[in-house]
């Protein structure tokens, strides 16, 4: 997305820069959390709340990239089959594919934070 923003001359916009940074941070967090879950599973340990945290992080990263693509690309993002279209469709289904985000957050609250179930 940064390359596309640069091509469109949007890197002077502080709001775009902020959103690019946020999206990158969300992607990096999702990547690291996913590696942590893979490591836990590779060691033969039981799944932990880290699994739900990684799922929520991945969903948040997908949504951030999808929304950013729509903002940077403007109307061309709506072209069927474009990068932005494909990414946004992935982002919209990501939360459902890994379990509703609300369910994941409830599992995190109960398992990781020790909060009562809703």
Feature locations, PLM:
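Alpha-helical interface subdomain recognition
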Residues: 1-118
């Amino acid at each position: 997305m940064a390359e596309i923003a640069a091509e469109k001359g949007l890197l002077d916009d502080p709001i775009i820069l902020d959103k690019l940074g946020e999206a990158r941070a969300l992607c990096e967090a999702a990547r690291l959390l996913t590696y942590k879950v893979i490591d836990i599973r590779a060691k033969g340990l039981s799944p932990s709340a880290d699994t739900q945290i990684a799922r929520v992080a991945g969903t948040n990263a997908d949504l951030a990239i999808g929304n950013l693509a729509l903002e940077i690309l403007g109307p061309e993002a709506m072209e069927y089959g474009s990068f932005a279209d494909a990414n946004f469709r992935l982002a919209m289904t990501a939360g459902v594919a890994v379990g509703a985000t609300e369910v994941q957050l409830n599992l995190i609250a109960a398992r990781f934070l020790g909060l009562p179930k809703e």
